[in-house]
Amino acid sequence: MASGILVNVKEEVTCPICLELLTQPLSLDCGHSFCQACLTANHKKSTLDKGERSCPVCRVSYQPKNIRPNRHVANIVEKLREVKLSPEGQKVDHCARHGEKLLLFCKEDGKVICWLCERSQEHRGHHTFLTEEVAQKYQVKLQAALEMLRQKQQEAEELEADIREEKASWKTQIQYDKTSVLADFEQLRDILDWEESNELQNLEKEEEDILKSLTKSETEMVQQTQSVRELISDVEHRLQGSVMELLQGVDGVIKRMQNVTLKKPETFPKNQRRVFRAPNLKGMLEVFRELTDVRRYWVDVTVAPNDISYAVISEDMRQVSCPEPQIIYGAQGTTYQTYVNFNYCTGILGSQSITSGKHYWEVDVSKKSAWILGVCAGFQPDAMYNIEQNENYQPQYGYWVIGLEEGVKCSAFQDGSFHNPSAPFIVPLSVIICPDRVGVFLDYEACTVSFFNITNHGFLIYKFSHCSFSQPVFPYLNPRKCRVPMTLCSPSS
């Protein structure tokens, strides 16, 4: 009874224009009351349309000077806003704003409303239906989405199990590798301590990086599974609850369910990793003795800029990289990129002029797919033609160099054959591990230039013998078209 009286009172203090509780109510001579904003808007419209002012309800004319604030109604509205509804009025099937039963479903807003809500400005023009008419339709949608979610939950749990298994497998594998490294280096402890430490550090970093990534993936998989579980719980709660709970915000829930996409964990294929294998211990001992010997002649090499080379040089004169491709403007506004003089003219000489003695330096070429390095007797300005075919890279022209192209093809450049002396003889080089760091040793008096694969324990890559050094020679670097820099290493690195 009290709830019904309360509803009747609310109807009496509801604005006939906006159908909401009166805000700053104003009364006319006829006794009708309106919100101040609603009456002002109606007054402007009436003046424009007819030139007269009349009550929006009974059409009785009024004078603006007779409009008065209705404080009594304002007090009633204020009390109504403070009054709590009775337990009966607090039922979930009644509108919290108007106290009417929630019998309608608004398609645009995806929620249940009462008949007064339907007539309010908020829902004006929206498509509304009886809740009984749409409940079954949304129940079918939710059920279908729930089945899909359960399948994704199973997939998520399988992914979570797989990542845990892979994490354990990686840990076991790397622990085994560490043990193997320790056993292999024990036989060469006196001269291989630094190599053992380096190898273990690489494995530790590999373990740290991979396990860190896998742990991160595991956390993401756990969060992903939990997210799906929570969404399933929400849907099950709706399906088990009342029609009102089922429909309230149902479109948003369905959209969330349909947008669920399982993220695959990051994996690391074991067949692509670098696996440590101990070389022949006797041969390795000889290699280390040779490398240790030539490293006694390590000189601090930097490059010397010149007007011939297009190479980009760092401020410390240690890094050399390929320039940006030039943009060529063609006919009808077309453009394309090209590397002008990309081979020979990106070469650069070291600043040290060598006329005698033994000299050693190392070049970091990690992550580069193409490079040329070695020793040069100086640029040949008259030999800057046919540069795309490497014609210049021959000992007869003063170049004792090796190079890499396409990331895997390592070659040495020798003099051309008797039948084709202008083209260099390309010597394919067999390297077990592609070098990330190359050591160059020049013995001026012995007329030799040797190249060492520092990445693979310092094994010899290639050696030029019987070199004809008729003039001063210089270290030579060419980054080719690969924009990753090549770096001259300092003796302390």
From Swiss-Prot:
The keyword Metal-binding applies. Zn(2+) binds at C95, H98, C117, H123. SMART domains: BBOX, RING, SPRY. Pathway: Protein modification; protein ubiquitination. It is found in: Cytoplasm; Nucleus. The keyword Transit peptide does not apply. GO terms for molecular function: pattern recognition receptor activity; ubiquitin-protein transferase activity; zinc ion binding. SUPFAM superfamilies: B-box zinc-binding domain, Concanavalin A-like lectins/glucanases, RING/U-box. Residues 131-223 form a coiled coil. Residues 185-198 are annotated as: Required for interaction with GABARAP and for autophagy. The modification N-acetylalanine is found at A2. A zinc finger (B box-type) spans 90-132. PANTHER family: E3 UBIQUITIN-PROTEIN LIGASE TRIM. Can form homodimers and homotrimers. In addition to lower-order dimerization, also exhibits a higher-order multimerization and both low- and high-order multimerizations are essential for its restriction activity. Interacts with BTBD1 and BTBD2. Interacts with PSMC4, PSMC5, PSMD7 and HSPA8/HSC70. Interacts (via B30.2/SPRY domain) with HSPA1A/B. Interacts with PSMC2, MAP3K7/TAK1, TAB2 and TAB3. Interacts with SQSTM1. Interacts with TRIM6 and TRIM34. Interacts with ULK1 (phosphorylated form), GABARAP, GABARAPL1, GABARAPL2, MAP1LC3A, MAP1LC3C and BECN1. This is Tripartite motif-containing protein 5.
